[in-house]
């Protein structure tokens, strides 16, 4: 494909910057000589040298003649120069001179920022200057300033930092995202197109655990990916070793269905929620029952706080309860019949889904609570009943299963649905879905038609429909360490491990 003249010139500029950045001086000189182009104009060199040497008068003069991307932003960029000059004066102890520089910057658009800076500078006069200034977000170096200024200057004059690498990363990201089977990046090269095939999906039934005598309602992987815990209608929970494919402990202590189970952040403990109105704390290393937490009604779900010192439970009696490990109730909210809950990775926000039958209507919503203030931040009303919620690793997205046959992907920063996944059957049971793959590139869900479905998260394309269970698949969970393994739990009393490879023991 022939490049037009403008495109050729832009490519040459990119190459010149690349050679300059990586110290290929002879190659740079040769390309400049052959093309008649330069990696940097004399004006740009003067600006860079002045900033790096702290020659602020020369820097201001050099910047004043620069062509900008947006001329209306010139004062904003000039303020960056003055701010750096001011902060360096303050760090050196020249407090009065630093404040004078700020007060003599002619624009009034930055008065609030100037007032804040003056306050910090005056306070720093009585403390460690550098520490206080850096602590308040003003620790940029001169090189940082140059990079900031480059964002204002026209790219025809000064290319943004490492522009070629940035473009190559964009090309790489695009190629990877366009491959619906992409899971783990292998052997990527810019010399050929990236391809990912279906072997990246864990679609093979690797092992079946038959240890339960009744329906398995929920499963949970340990954070180290070595163990899987299951919750069953047979009133027990089981810890499985998914490496050696064996049962480790059967946890006996509940007198009714075990509905939900979760590992502590350090994998030292397990919490099991039951229809017998209790939550039990277990020692995951020994299988020993450590403590009972009594409720007034059955308990449907729970989640741990990141420090592992407390946890939250949800119940059909519309109560959300924050517990300490020693059994103290720290706080209690009242909402709706709680089906499921999820906590952001930083432990600041609690998402709950539930349903309540009112006199003349039904209340179906997602509620978001601040763990710190304990206030309800937002309630999102829904048309259908939500049976489960699962957060992405970065806590920016959530999956919810809605009756009768849709899994929705939510953008949690904007609180809106961005994608939907269809084909499965939801309705009579509480079916769980989850993210999967190394970078959460897949979406998985159980179904009342005994199948498991895997979709490409970004496109919504159905990638695989898996058979194996002979009754409703209640829950799926993805191994947090092994990107090629997930587990499923069903009403056929089994827990199944899925992989992208065959189990040699079953052949």
From Swiss-Prot:
CDD domains: WD40. This is GID complex subunit 7. PROSITE patterns: CTLH, LISH, WD_REPEATS_1, WD_REPEATS_2, WD_REPEATS_REGION. The keyword Phosphoprotein does not apply. Residues 40-97 form the CTLH domain. Residues 7-39 form the LisH domain. GO terms for biological process: negative regulation of gluconeogenesis; proteasome-mediated ubiquitin-dependent protein catabolic process. The keyword Transmembrane does not apply. InterPro entries: CTLH_C, G-protein_beta_WD-40_rep, LisH, WD40/YVTN_repeat-like_dom_sf, WD40_repeat_dom_sf, WD40_rpt, WD_repeat-ST_regulator. Identified in the GID/CTLH complex. In the absence of stress, the complex exists as an inactive anticipatory complex (GID(Ant)), composed of Gid1, the E3 ubiquitin-ligase Gid2, Gid5, Gid8, and the RING-like subunit Gid9, awaiting a substrate receptor to form the active E3 ligase complex. When cells are shifted to glucose-containing medium, the substrate receptor Gid4 is induced and becomes part of the complex, named GID(SR4). Additionally, Gid7 transforms the GID(SR4) E3 ligase core into a higher-order supramolecular assembly (Chelator-GID(SR4)). Component of the GID E3 ligase complex recruiting N termini and catalyzing ubiquitination of proteins targeted for degradation. GID E3 is regulated through assembly with interchangeable N-degron-binding substrate receptors induced by distinct environmental perturbations. Required for the adaptation to the presence of glucose in the growth medium; mediates in association with the substrate receptor VID24/GID4 the degradation of enzymes involved in gluconeogenesis when cells are shifted to glucose-containing medium. It is found in: Cytoplasm; Nucleus. One of its GO terms (cellular component) is cytosol. WD repeats lie at residues 211-250, 253-292, 294-334, 342-380, 381-420, 425-467, 468-507. Keywords: Cytoplasm, Nucleus, Repeat, WD repeat. Belongs to the GID7 family. It comes from Schizosaccharomyces pombe (strain 972 / ATCC 24843) (Fission yeast).
């Amino acid at each position: 494909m022939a490049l037009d003249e403008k495109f050729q010139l832009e490519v040459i500029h990119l190459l010149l910057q690349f050679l300059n950045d990586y110290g290929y001086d002879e190659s740079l000189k040769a390309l400049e000589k052959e093309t008649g182009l330069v990696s940097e104009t004399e004006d740009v060199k003067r600006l860079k040298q002045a900033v790096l040497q702290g020659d602020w008068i020369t820097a201001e003069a050099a910047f004043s003649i620069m062509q900008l991307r947006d001329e209306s932003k010139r004062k904003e960029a000039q303020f960056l120069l003055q701010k750096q000059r001011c902060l360096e004066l303050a760090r050196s102890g020249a407090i009065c001179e630093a404040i004078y520089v700020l007060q003599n910057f002619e624009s009034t658009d930055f008065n609030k920022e100037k007032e804040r800076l003056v306050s910090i500078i005056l306070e720093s006069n009585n403390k460690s200057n550098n520490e206080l200034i850096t602590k308040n977000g003003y620790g940029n170096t001169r090189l940082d300033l140059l990079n900031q200024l480059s964002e204002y200057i026209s790219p025809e004059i000064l290319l943004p930092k490492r522009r070629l690498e940035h473009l190559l990363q964009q090309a790489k990201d695009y190629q990877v995202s366009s491959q619906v089977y992409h899971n783990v990046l292998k052997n990527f090269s810019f010399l050929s197109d990236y391809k990912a095939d279906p072997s990246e999906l864990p679609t093979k039934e690797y092992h079946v655990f038959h240890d339960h005598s009744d329906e398995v309602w929920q499963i949970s992987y340990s954070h180290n990916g070595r163990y899987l815990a299951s919750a069953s209608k047979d009133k027990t929970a089981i810890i499985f070793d998914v490496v050696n494919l064996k049962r480790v402990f059967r946890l006996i202590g509940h007198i009714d269905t075990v509905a939900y189970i979760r590992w502590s952040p350090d994998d030292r403990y397990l919490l099991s929620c039951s229809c017998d109105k209790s939550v039990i704390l277990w020692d995951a290393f020994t299988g020993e029952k450590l403590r009972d937490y009594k409720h007034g009604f059955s308990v449907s779900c729970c989640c741990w706080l990141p420090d592992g010192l407390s946890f939250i439970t949800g119940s059909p009696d519309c109560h959300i309860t924050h517990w300490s490990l020693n059994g103290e109730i720290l706080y209690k909210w009242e909402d709706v019949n709680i089906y499921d809950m999820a906590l952001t990775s930083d432990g600041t926000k609690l998402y709950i889904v539930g349903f309540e039958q009112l006199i003349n209507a039904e209340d179906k919503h997602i509620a978001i609570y601040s763990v710190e203030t304990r206030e309800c931040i937002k309630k999102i009303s829904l048309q259908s009943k939500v049976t489960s919620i699962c957060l992405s690793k970065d806590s920016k997205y959530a999956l919810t299963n809605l009756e009768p046959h849709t899994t929705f992907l939510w953008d949690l920063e904007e609180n809106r649905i961005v994608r939907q996944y269809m084909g499965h059957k939801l309705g009579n049971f509480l079916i769980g879905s989850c993210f999967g793959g190394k970078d959460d590139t897949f979406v998985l869900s159980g179904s009342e038609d005994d199948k498991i479905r895997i979709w490409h998260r970004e496109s919504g394309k159905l990638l695989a429909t898996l058979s194996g269970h002979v009754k409703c698949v209640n829950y799926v969970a993805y191994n947090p360490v092994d990107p090629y393994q997930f587990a499923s739990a069903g009403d056929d009393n089994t827990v199944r491990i899925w992989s992208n490879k065959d189990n040699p023991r079953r052949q």
